[in-house]
C-alpha cells in the first residue's frame, strides 16, 4: 500500500503528527514546511541502511520536529544528525565519549534525544548531562 502524500500534507497542515515511510516518501520539503507552520511532528520510519548524511538533509528542514524511528549508535554520524535537529534514540552501550557533545548538540539544535544503555555513566554524570541538556535529553 502506498502512502497518500496529499493526506499526509493535509494532516500536517492541520497540526496532526504523522509517520512517513522513508522509502515511499515524496516531496519532503513540503511536509517539513507544513510541519514548521503547524507545529506538527514527523516520524520517519523504514530508514535502516540510510546514510546519516542523507538523514541530516531531511531533519535539518524542520529541526526538533523530525523523529527518526530507529536506535542509533553513539558515534560521529549520529552526532551530526543531532546537530541538524533530529529527534532520536541513541544507544550508549559502548560507553561513547561523545555523549557530552551529543547533549550539547541536542540543546543547541532543538533536537530531543533519548539515551539508552548508559550503564557506564554514574548517576552523578547522568544528572550533570540532564542539567546540561534540559528538556532536550532523557536517559532510560
Predicted feature locations:
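General marker for long, soluble alpha-helical cores
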Residues: 1-140
Amino acid at each position: 500500500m502506498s502512502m497518500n502524500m496529499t493526506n499526509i500534507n493535509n494532516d500536517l497542515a492541520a497540526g496532526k503528527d504523522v509517520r512517513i515511510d522513508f522509502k515511499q516518501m515524496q516531496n519532503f520539503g513540503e511536509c517539513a514546511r507544513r510541519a514548521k507552520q503547524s507545529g506538527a511532528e514527523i516520524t520517519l520510519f523504514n530508514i535502516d541502511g540510510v546514510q546519516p548524511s542523507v538523514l541530516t538533509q531531511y531533519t535539518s528542514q524542520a529541526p526538533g520536529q523530525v523523529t527518526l524511528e530507529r536506535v542509533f549508535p553513539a558515534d560521529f554520524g549520529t552526532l551530526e544528525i543531532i546537530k541538524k535537529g533530529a529527534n532520536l534514540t541513541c544507544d550508549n552501550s559502548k560507553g561513547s565519549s561523545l555523549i557530552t557533545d551529543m547533549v550539547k548538540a541536542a540543546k543547541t539544535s532543538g533536537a530531543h534525544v533519548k539515551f539508552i544503555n548508559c550503564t557506564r555513566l554514574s548517576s552523578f554524570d547522568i544528572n550533570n548531562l540532564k542539567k546540561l541538556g534540559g528538556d532536550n535529553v532523557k536517559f532510560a
